[in-house]
Regions:
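AMP-binding/adenylate-forming catalytic domain of the ANL superfamily
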Residues: 70-90, 102-106, 624, 635-638, ...
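Non-catalytic C-terminal accessory region of glycerolipid acyltransferases
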Residues: 1, 702, 864-984
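Gly/Ser/Thr-rich phosphate-binding loop
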Residues: 396-400, 412-506, 520, 528-529
Length: 984
């Protein structure tokens, strides 16, 4: 007789564990429990973490037996609580074909184990559906590898330290748990007002792990504009409805001034202190799930991952909605375009509140397992050589920056500060976020060629927040492509006709390359029709990384995604970038922002070109020049105005500078500016990322306040404090009145309820017939609800007339649910309640006298017996009422459904009548003790009939199983339509 072949000889424990997890993962995905998939580990609790009830376990057992070709004892359904328990049971179970099975060698078993492990992780990082998955993947697969080398600016100078992928994830997990303890809900918006620091990375990752949404905003950096800063940031925070603001010590006072201006903001917290509290917090009890992993905090690809507020260079800031799917699509496309990998090294100084810094310089590199050397923007701006020295030190290979950064390096870095510098490792120097100056590209390449920098490494790119980040990227290793076009034809007719070699008046544009993989770009006219090559038009784009719109801003969204650009199902809508461009030889040349272009004498004038010409004048501050147009109604055209900052105060000197600007612009454009206005330094408003606010500059110019001096910082802070105090008092007074009324109502409710329940309970106690007890209770509830001033509206009651036994299935929101249901629907059914409810004073008597069912949630055998009891009642013609969620929480949303009721429907043919409850959660939210007055609505949907199948046993057949899932999904969808809540 051959040796008995068991799984031990066929697979080692690692392979068996991976296979078990694979089977469970497949079942969870089939059940639609996508939120549970990220929680799946060898030690996950099958019921609490993964939501697998008794019937799901029965199905799982059958699948494991098939996968491993063995039989498992029936008791495993009740006794196995984790995948690890199932693995151990499998390793000790005999195979079905033991007589015929051949024992495998240790080598073959090892190969099998490795193959199973490879199969489970073969898709790797590209299987990640959310940023949470990315963080977890890197923590598991690259825990010991350094991800971030952060140089912080502190009071004592610079400090550099590192974070591995594992350390980042661990710190973020603790931060997420602390955020959950502080009441940040899933989907809640948390603002990050932080400088470049360890706290930013940990906090941002922690917010994501908590299932919340980061909202990065820039910290205050100019004391003389603190009032303007407060107005702009409070507008952002109000639009985002943030619940928590994380800041740093030096900005905490300013951050607290914002609180009275933002109604949704509950607290302002020092991020360092929050992280410190998180580190000191006790770990969860053995077997307990961390707070941030409970409820609905797991995210889906379609959930919002980030609100990226545009810097507002042409208008008010708008919150770009970016989902996990949007971000991952862009990050992967960019990585493919620049061939990013773990062998690369990123070097960045970009601000993390800007999309190029947050998404481009960090999250994309996190996805590809790339280490990043990080420094602050201030460190770069004060000493730009530090950026290049970081490339030398870390052997950096990739970086992105706006055009001005490369220009700053050319103008500010002295040879003595970069002796011995080696930039030969730098293979991709991305230049974007603002118009790319071809002269800057050439100057940078020439200036640093002696240090090993190659012109071919330069990559002028195009992107915007509405596309997540990038839209176009040029080919690697080619270098910049500059197109010189005839100025007259381009500015008057919009045709990009190549200029002759000797044309000194030619206008130059830099190619931004071709669309990133899986994305499209088209150039259209005002009617949305595509224009031919070398014809200027409006740049539209589409693809998986394009935003769905602006957060809580429907009007702006309609302009961004016009209704006439909507396409057929399965295709992405075209998005209007707001930029003008032309296409030549398949590459995109961006010419300027639509709102910024000046039309003078029938010619299009591009502000950035005017500003570049004016910057050549001696005495003008570089990067502090704005050109814009003013309507000249008499001439029927626009006047060209140039506003520039200068430190020169003398009238004669200022006049000479203005004359120089006029001459340079006239020579370059062929027409003079109508006005040149010189103003003091610091007058021109800029975005947080250093972009010029042209529209705001224009409005200040028209109001004659552009060069007006700002009040001292202490005056602005005092003013903000005074208005904030008034708002705080007003808000707190109204909140106190509201709270007082709630307390009075709560006390009134308890008095009324006590006076009602004692006689009602006494009478019900002596009624022996459960139907009569139900009718009496429904009548008595009319009195209670009238006294409570809580109206109950019922819709769809006609569906109760459906003949035969029925299963009523409702969402579960609070302990209060049963009362309005008995009032609104009567009690022509038996409730199925958890055992804990039956033990409550008075309530237990009602349940017993009216013949309702109770079950023990913690006992799988009890749940299976309950399913059998349900079927027996239904076959007798009695209807039942179930809460398929099995429990409720304080959090809004429809939780996953247990399958017991749906199995009963399939086995007996009884229809499901979905019942939607709305208002009961607000009346008595879990975790609160005082009810709040509200209206309750009960909506019944048409009955859902099970389709005939072949099974009728406790172990569903394949057709039964799929019918259970269909019934469950149809019921959830019907309930969510009228409940006012979303699916979790």
């Amino acid at each position: 007789m051959r040796p008995v072949a068991t799984p031990t000889t066929q697979l080692d424990s690692l392979a068996a564990r991976e296979r078990v997890l694979e089977v469970i993962r497949s079942l969870l995905e089939e059940l639609g429990s996508h939120g549970a998939v990220p929680l799946l580990t060898a030690n996950s609790q099958l019921d609490r973490d993964l939501g697998l009830g008794s019937l799901e376990r029965v199905e799982l057992l059958g699948r494991l037996e098939t996968a491993f070709n063995l039989r498992l004892p029936d008791r495993i359904v009740a006794e196995a609580n984790t995948p690890e328990h199932l693995t151990r049971a499998i390793l000790g179970a005999p195979g079905i074909d033991a007589e015929e099975a051949e024992p495998e060698s240790a080598m073959r078993a090892s190969v099998a184990a490795q193959k199973l492990h490879s199969d489970a992780s073969d898709a790797g990082i590209f299987a990640a559906e959310t940023l949470i998955d990315v963080l977890r993947y890197r923590a598991v697969h690259d825990a010991e590898r350094t991800h971030l080398s952060i140089t912080e600016d502190t009071d004592g100078g610079e400090r550099t330290f590192t974070l591995t992928f594992g350390e980042l994830y661990a710190a973020a997990q603790r931060c997420a748990a602390e955020l959950a303890r502080r009441g940040v809900p899933a989907g809640g918006r948390v603002a990050l007002m932080l400088p470049t620091s360890r706290a930013f990375f940990v906090s941002c990752a922690g917010i994501l792990l908590a299932g919340a949404i980061p909202v990065p905003i820039y910290p205050p950096f100019r004391a003389d504009r603190i009032e303007e800063y407060a107005a702009r940031q409070s507008a952002i925070l109000n639009n985002a409805e943030v619940c928590l603001l994380l800041t740093f010590r030096r900005a905490e006072a300013v951050a607290k001034l914002l609180k009275p201006r933002v109604r949704s903001l509950t607290s302002v917290v020092d991020a360092e202190m929050l992280i410190e509290a998180a580190d000191k917090a006790p770990p969860p009890a053995p077997g307990a799930l961390p707070l941030h992993l409970t409820g609905s905090r797991a995210r889906k690809a379609s959930d919002i991952a980030l609100l990226q507020y545009t810097s507002g260079s042409t208008g008010d800031p708008k919150g770009v909605v970016l989902t996990h799917a949007n971000l991952l699509a862009n990050m992967r496309a960019v990585g493919e375009a620049v061939q990013l990998g773990p062998d690369d090294v990123g070097v960045t100084w970009l601000p993390l509140y800007h999309d190029m810094g947050l998404i481009g310089a960090w999250l994309t590199l996190l996805h590809f397992g790339t280490p990043v050397a990080v420094m602050s923007p201030i460190s770069f701006l004060t000493r730009p050589e530090r950026w290049l020295q970081a490339f030398h030190k870390h052997r950096g290979t990739i970086a992105a920056a706006p055009n001005f950064a490369y220009e700053l390096c050319v103008r500010k870095i002295a040879d003595k500060d970069i002796q011995g510098l080696d930039l030969s490792s730098w293979r991709a120097a991305l230049n974007g976020a603002e118009p790319v100056n071809p002269e800057t590209l050439e100057r940078f390449a020439q200036r640093f060629a002696a240090y090993g920098f190659r012109r071919e490494a330069q990559l002028p790119v195009y992107g915007l927040a509405e596309a997540s980040l990038a839209v176009t990227v040029p080919p690697l290793g080619r270098g910049p492509l500059v197109d010189r076009v005839d100025r007259e034809l381009f500015t008057s007719e919009g045709r990009a006709v190549p200029a002759s070699p000797g044309d000194s008046a030619a206008i130059s544009f830099v190619s931004s390359g071709k669309p990133i993989p899986r994305h499209e770009v088209r150039i259209v006219d005002e009617q949305g029709n595509e224009v031919p090559d070398r014809a200027e038009g409006f740049l539209w784009f589409r693809g998986p990384s394009a935003t769905s719109g602006y957060y809580r801003n429907e009007a702006a969204t309609k302009l961004l995604i016009p209704s006439d650009t909507q396409t057929q199902d399965g295709e992405y809508a075209w998005v209007n970038s707001g930029d003008r461009a032309y296409r030549a030889d398949g590459e995109i040349y961006v010419t300027g922002r639509v709102k910024d272009i000046i039309i003078k004498g029938g010619r299009n004038i591009y502000p950035h070109e005017v500003e570049e010409l004016a910057a050549r004048a001696e005495g003008i501050r570089k990067g502090c020049i704005v050109a814009f147009g003013l309507t000249d109604e008499n001439a029927g055209t626009e006047k060209l105005v140039v506003v520039a900052e200068t430190r020169e105060r003398g009238t004669a000197k200022a006049a000479a500078i203005a004359a120089s600007v006029t001459e340079l612009v006239t020579q370059g454009l062929g027409l003079p500016p109508d006005r040149v206005e010189l103003i003091p330094p610091g007058s021109i408003p800029k975005t947080s990322s250093g972009k010029l606010r042209r529209e705001e500059t224009k409005q200040l110019y028209l109001a004659a306040t552009l060069s007006a001096s700002k009040p001292p910082a202490w005056v602005q802070i005092a003013k903000l404090g005074a208005t904030g105090a008034a708002r705080t008092f007003n808000q707190e007074f109204r909140a106190a009145v509201s709270r007082g009324l709630e307390i009075l109502y709560g006390l009134y409710f308890f008095v009324i309820f006590f006076l009602w329940i004692v006689p009602t309970w006494t009478i019900v106690h002596f009624i022996k017939d459960h139907r009569a007890a139900g009718r009496f209770t429904s009548s008595a509830l009319k009195v209670l609800f009238a006294l409570m001033r809580c109206p109950v509206r019922v819709a769809g009651k006609e569906y109760m007339e459906t003949p035969g036994a029925k299963i009523y299935a409702s969402n579960h929101t609070s302990y209060f649910d049963v009362l309005p249901l008995m009032l609104g629907l009567g009690v022509p059914y038996r409730f199925v309640a958890k055992l804990e409810v039956g033990k409550m004073p008075f309530i237990g008597t009602f349940l017993d006298q009216m013949g309702h069912l109770k079950f023990d949630r913690t006992d799988p055998h009890s749940r299976l017996r309950q399913a059998e009891e349900l079927e027996e009642l239904l076959r007798k013609g009695e209807s039942v009422f179930v809460f398929p969620e099995g429990t409720f929480t304080s959090e809004d949303g429809i939780r996953p459904f247990q399958l017991g009721a749906f199995k009963a429907a399939v086995s007996t043919g009884a229809p499901i009548i979905p019942v939607s409850l709305a208002g009961t959660r607000r009346f008595l939210r879990d975790g609160t003790f005082l009810p709040r007055p509200t209206n309750v609505t009960i909506t019944l949907s048409p009955p859902i009939y099970p389709r005939p199948t072949g099974g009728a046993s406790n172990s569903p057949s394949s057709s039964d199983w799929h019918e259970l899932i269909r019934l469950r999904d149809a019921t959830r969808e019907a309930i969510v339509r009228h409940s006012g809540e979303h699916l979790l």
